[in-house]
Amino acid sequence: MSVLISNDAELDTLLDAQEVEHICGVVLAAEGVEREVEISLSYVDEDEMHELNHEWRGIDRTTDVLSFECDSAFDEDIPADETLELGDIILAPQVIARQAPGFGNSSADECRLMLVHGMLHLLGYDH
C-alpha cells in the first residue's frame, strides 16, 4: 500500500504520515483487501473544502472529509498483480479541529475518525 500525502497549504495535519499509513492499512486489512493499493490524501483549508463540496456535491458549505473512489478494491476484472488506485481522500483539518469538542474528541482523534470514514467510502460504503 502507498499513501500519497499532499499539504500544499502547509496546514497542521493533526496526524503524521506514519500514523496515516497505519490507519489506512488497518482499514484495508479489516475489510479483507489484500492487494496492492494506492491512496491519495490531501489536506486543504476550509475555503478550498467549501469550494470542493459545492463543486462536487452541490452543497454550499464546508465539510470535514470528502472521498472520491477510483478503482474498486474488489473489482475482479483488474489483474491481481496491478496496483489499484483506490481513490482520493480530502481532509479539512481546521474544520475537523473545530468540530472535535462537540463530539467529545481531541482534534487528532476526530481526524483519525474522518480518515477511517474516508477510507470506508473508498471501499464502497455510503451513508
Q: Language-model features: where?
A:
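An acidic/histidine-cluster motif and surrounding catalytic segment
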Residues: M1-R112, L120-H127
